[in-house]
Amino acid sequence: MAKADKTWSLKEIDESRGSSKGTAFLAFKQLKESFDEGRDFYYLNSAQDGREIDKLRADGRIYESTVNAILLTEHGYSAVVDYLDG
């Protein structure tokens, strides 16, 4: 993952919109087939990216129960927000 890239977690999207937990994840699932990993989102696997996931959790960027994390790029974020806005 390019460290300089601005990313959004699903939790951050839920909270910024005042949505219930899981709303952004459901939108992501609907759009996932049209997304490209590395362009639209980054998938962090707990086995390989555990330290980064722990830092995201400590920073409050992901839900406490998150095992594997999804971070959306600007492009992915815009697509999810557009989907949620209908």
Report residues per predicted region.
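Positively charged, aromatic-accented nucleic-acid-binding surfaces
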Residues: 1-29, 42-86
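Short, solvent-exposed alpha-helical "recognition" segments
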Residues: 30-40
